[in-house]
Structure formats: structure tokens, C-alpha cells
UniProtKB/Swiss-Prot annotation:
Its main location: secreted. Residues 1-22 form the signal peptide. The keyword Transmembrane helix does not apply. It comes from Conus textile (Cloth-of-gold cone). PROSITE patterns: OMEGA_CONOTOXIN. The presence of a 'disulfide through disulfide knot' structurally defines this protein as a knottin. Transmembrane segments: none annotated. Omega-conotoxins act at presynaptic membranes, they bind and block voltage-gated calcium channels (Cav). This is Omega-conotoxin-like TeA61. Disulfide bonds join 52-67, 59-70, 66-75. It comes from the Eukaryota. Keywords: Calcium channel impairing toxin, Disulfide bond, Ion channel impairing toxin, Knottin, Neurotoxin, Presynaptic neurotoxin, Secreted, Signal, Toxin, Voltage-gated calcium channel impairing toxin. GO terms for molecular function: calcium channel regulator activity; ion channel inhibitor activity; toxin activity.
Length: 76
């Protein structure tokens, strides 16, 4: 009985936490569809088209775009 109550409380807590920390609960699916439509019209806007940097190329520590890791401003 205690375990069941604890599980119910945990599920309720996690559900409330999910709703409280959601980015945008209003029209969330609509925004996703608009973004997908924009990416279909403009393929360059898609994140799938971004090229990762090969080993030895210069990278940025804060926004690394390496295929592997960014170590001391160079891709590894």
C-alpha cells in the first residue's frame, strides 16, 4: 500500500514538473508544423544539412560543430 501511494505521488510530481518546465505549452504542435514547413521551403534552414568539422579543423569551445570533440580550439 505504501509503495503504491509513493508511486502515485511520484507520477503526479513528475507530471507536474513536466508541465511546469515546458518551453511553450500554447500551440506547441502548431509551432512544430510551421517550423517543419519552413524547413521544407528552405532546405538550408534544416539542422540535418549542417556539416560537422573534421579532425584538425578549428572549432569553437562554446558552440562546437566537430564530428568528434573540440579540444583546445581544434577538432579531435
Amino acid at each position: 500500500m505504501k509503495l503504491t501511494c509513493m508511486m502515485i505521488v511520484a507520477v503526479l510530481f513528475l507530471t507536474a514538473w513536466t508541465f511546469a518546465t515546458a518551453d511553450d505549452s500554447s500551440n506547441g504542435l502548431g509551432n512544430l508544423f510551421l517550423k517543419a514547413h519552413h524547413e521544407m521551403k528552405n532546405p538550408e534552414a534544416s539542422k540535418l544539412n549542417e556539416r560537422c568539422l573534421d579532425a584538425g579543423e578549428v572549432c569553437d569551445i562554446f558552440f562546437p560543430t566537430c564530428c568528434g570533440y573540440c579540444i583546445l580550439l581544434f577538432c579531435a
